Every structure is written in structure tokens, then in C-alpha cells.
Amino acid sequence: MSSSASAIGDRFRTVAAAAVVLAAATVQGAPEIVPDPPSISAKSYILMDGTTRTVLAERDSGEPLPPASLTKIMTSYVAAAELAAGRITLDDQVPISVKAWRTSGSKMFVREGTEVALSELLRGVVIVSGNDASVAVAEYIAGAEDAFADMMNRHAKDLGLTSTRFVNSSGLPDDGHYSSAKDMAILSAELIERFPEHYRLYAEKSFQYGEIERPQLNRNRLLWRDKSVDGVKTGLTEAAGYCLVVSALREGTRLIAAVMGATSDEDRLRDAQKLLAYGFRYFETHDLYDHGEPLANPWVWYGTVENVAVGIDETLRITVPRGRYDDLSAVIDLPDEIMAPIAAGDRVGVVRVTLDDEILAERDLLARSEVVESGFFARRGDDIERFMGGLFGDSAEADANVPSAEAPADQ
């Protein structure tokens, strides 16, 4: 090929697929054999990474079941969303209705006709699982509990909870009230991610309200057994059995386990502990790409600049079996040609991360800067180069930065 033809070919820097090699910053150990998940007694369960949402183990996790007081995770989620929107404040004084006072089951022991700070009611919902507190919060936010249930269901739809329907704020039994282990795990992950300050309530081990002589203890006994556990919620009714969603954070990795329909308190605790131990022992999570990190610099036709940097709009994390990080591969998928004008944030292509041909993550590649369309004569010059490139040029891979990731500490 002549030097002039080669120069033209060098202008064709966009490709259908440019391979990206993943390299760890430290040497990875040999891949481990991941055994089957532990034996779990609960009717359904799930174990997932709380950040990547990768499912590590599950059985019948999408089955709709009575959630009992796991319902209150959504009750507190709705309250946290209303707080974030500025429609309510923690200092608001909430009137206690007859309905709230008379609600059966576990109680915070609020009294009819009094007013209680919203901050205290939310502790009553989260820490002591008070049905009375849940109704009071629901009525204050939505005017009536059934209207609050509508809000809960709208949030459930927005979060993609496909096996969930609420009819009350407390989780008291109702044939039309149900959820699944998977939905409860996703809800908990969203609560932790979106409202971290509110989530801190779930780590509190006790709450003493008013004239109650002794503080009531958090029913999540794993808060005492495992220092890495920082929430989330228990549930119990005759129809639901013993339920538990638990989250633990170790060395920057967060796992969430949900069990529903266990036959005893000790069984649900043991099931959750086994799932967490399995997840932390056999899986690891890595940061692959940072928010805004340039992953490629493809050629742009008809622009005032020749290239545009592209990246993703989030930090991309991947959960894999221990020792398999080096087996990951990533592919950047770009169109054959990219034309100006381009606005910052425009979708230009995708990056796809795979392990053993299974897609683990796929994210849009967005332009990191604007590319303005060039003038008339410059565009005509590009027309000529595109024509000549079609005759003599050959495509080349787009430039791409190599991601790095630190090996997680032993857990």
C-alpha cells in the first residue's frame, strides 16, 4: 500500500468491535472451584451483590409470598423518598389516629390523640417493627393507609419489583399483599444506595420511646452476631413464616441475603449466615471503569476536532468467582462511522463485559465532549477522504484505555 493510501486508512479509526484486554493491578490467584450453594431451609431465598445486583445463589426467589414485616422496608423507603424531596421533615409532629393506636401486632406503643416526631416514628418502624408507627407514618404522608399503599406500589413498579403488591404499610396478612425474596433484596439494595443516611437506622440495636421502661431491641439478631451486618429487617406472621433480609459490608463489598418462609427464628438466622459466608468466600467484586473514564477515542467525520473521547456515566463494578478476574474480557462496540455534530452525553456505542461468553454487563458509551460540525470546505474534504478511504483504506481498532482493578483483600 502506498504511503498516501496508508495515511488515508489511518483516518478510519471506528470499528464494529474493538477488543479491550482487562489487566489486574496485582497478581490473581488460581481460579477456585465454586461449590454449589449451601443447603437452605427457607422456602425461598436469594444472595446478591448489593452494588452490582449480581445474583450469586437463589431458589424460587421470584415466588410471590407473604412478606410480613419486610413490608416496612418499603414503608421506610417511601418515607425516605418524601424526605429527600422536601415534602416532609424529620421534625414534623405526626398526629396519632385511633386506627394507628389500635393496629395489632408488634408495637412502638404510641397513644391515640398524641403527636410524635416523624424521626421517632421512623425508628419505631425500622428498629422495633411497630405496626402502629407504620400506620401513623402512612397516614401522615398520604392521608390514608390505602393511599400510602398506592404510593408503595408506584415505587415498586419504578424499581422493577415484578412480584410485589402492597395493600398496607405494616405487612399484616392480606391475600392481596405479597412480595418475593428477589424483590425484597432489590428494594433493600436501592434503599442502601439512594438513602444511605436513612439506612443507618437499620443498624441501631435498640430504641426506647416515651415512658416505656426498657428499650425495645432490634429483631435482627445478626446485628449482634456479625459485626459486618448493618441491616435490614425481619418479618413474622403465621402465613409468612420467619423472614429476613440482611446486608453485610466487608472490605468494600456489600452482599444482601433474603430468606422467606423459614420455620424458626434460628433457621432464618442460620440460613442468612450461611449465604453470607458462601458469598464472601467464593466471589469478589472489582471496579473496572470509573465514571467518565475515557475508554476509546474514535474518529469523527465532519467535525472541528478529529476524535471524541467516550466513556460511561457510572463506575462499573463486576462480581465474579474468586480468581476469575483475569478471564474477563470487554468489547467496545462502535458504529463504522461517527458523524458530527455530537453533543456531550450523546450515545456513541456500548462496552460489553463477558466471562465465558456470558454477558455480565453492558453500558452505553457516551461522548465526553461536544464536537461541532466543521465548515463547508472542511466537510467537502472529509467527503473526498471517505471516498478514497473506501477505495484504499482499511479499518483499524479505536484507541482504548486499559482498565485496572485492585484484587480485593481476603475476606
Language-model features: locations:
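Bacterial N-terminal signal peptides that target proteins for export
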Residues: 2-16
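Active-site-adjacent loops and short helices of periplasmic peptidoglycan-processing enzymes
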Residues: 7, 29-196, 212
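Intrinsic-disorder/low-complexity regions
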Residues: 9, 28, 48, 398-400, ...
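Bacterial N-terminal signal peptides
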Residues: 15-24
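Residues embedded in well-ordered secondary-structure elements
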Residues: 18, 34-36, 83, 237, ...
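Bacterial Sec-dependent signal peptides at the C-terminal "C-region" and cleavage site
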Residues: 23-32, 366
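Domain-terminus/edge residues, biased toward the C-terminal soluble/receptor-binding domains
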Residues: 161-162, 173-411
